[in-house]
Each structure stands twice: as C-alpha cells, then as structure tokens.
Regions:
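Low-complexity, acidic interaction segments enriched in glycine
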Residues: 1-2, 45
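Extracellular beta-strand scaffolds
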Residues: 1, 7-8, 18-30, 34-36, ...
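A general structural motif
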Residues: 4, 8-10, 42, 66
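Conserved hydrophobic/aromatic pocket- or pore-lining residues that grip, position, or stack substrates
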Residues: 13
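Predominantly polar beta-repeat domains that present long G/T/S/D/N-rich surfaces used to bind, process
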Residues: 39-151
Length: 151
C-alpha cells in the first residue's frame, strides 16, 4: 500500500495478508507528504502494517508525516540504500506517534555522517491522540508497567 496526501477527516488504513504467514506479511510505503488538513484533532490517520512502514529511496528531500504508524511485526524506517551517501535527504518531521515491533529509524549513521535516510529528524507527539485516536485503531483503556529498571 502506497500512501501520501492531505488527510481531511478520520481514517485508519490497514495492510495485511490473511491467514497470517510471516512469508507474506505486507508493508505500507509512505512515498510523499502525509499531512492533516487541521492539527486540532478533527483530522487523523492510523496506518497499521503487518510488516514494515517504509520511506522509499525516492521520497521528498523534506518530508512531513502526520499520523499514528504501527508496524505490527516489522520496522518503521527509511531503508539503508547502497552505496552510502547515494540517498541522503535533508529533513523528516513526524507529528503523531510511532509504534514499531523492530527498529524505528529515519537515518543511518556512520560516525558523525548520515549515510542513508534523513539527516535531520524531528518528532512531535500529537496529544489529541490520547482522547481521539483514529477510528478502530487498537487501544487500551488502562495502562500497565511492562518493565521497570532502577540503577
């Protein structure tokens, strides 16, 4: 599933293959800006992918993504593209939330150098999601501590 555009309203998109089989899990690809028409809570999008949520190699140099991204069994990322430095972009801004089973990264770095993905990354949580998540998006009415570590 390829996704981009301006979101007016409230929607959840899911991509998968059933019955579930890890060899056939499906990914969502955000190939351009995905932005809310309004950031007042009236517009929202949830994207649920069985596998990965991916930014492709030929994405915009400055990219903005609004929404809740959930990679159920995979990663949320810009893939590492070879050769190093061949696909470095300027900036990605996310507004919403990212939920990922595996890695979450928009940048691949070697020392102080970005070698693939986005050089500058900015993330802001959309506090409207607390009381108004996308329709039918998985949620829980209570919180629990999954782990605790004190040093």
């Amino acid at each position: 599933m390829w996704v981009e555009g301006i979101i007016e309203g409230r929607v959840t998109l899911g991509v998968g293959s059933f019955p579930e089989n890890s060899a056939t899990y499906k990914s969502a690809i955000i190939n351009g800006n995905l932005v809310y028409n309004n950031k007042d809570g009236s517009d929202t999008i949830g994207i649920i992918a069985q596998k990965d949520i991916v930014i492709p190699k030929f994405s915009p140099d400055v990219l903005e993504i609004n929404g809740v991204l959930l990679a159920q069994y995979g990663a949320t990322q810009s893939y590492y593209y070879h050769p190093a430095g061949s696909s470095v972009k300027n900036q990605i801004t996310t507004y919403g939330s990212v939920i990922s089973n595996q890695i979450w990264t928009w940048s691949w770095v070697n020392g102080n150098n970005t070698i693939s993905g986005y050089r500058n990354t900015y993330t802001t949580y959309d506090s409207n999601l607390i009381y108004a998540p996308p329709p039918y998006f998985p949620k829980k009415n209570e919180f629990e501590v999954l782990s605790w570590d004190e040093e």
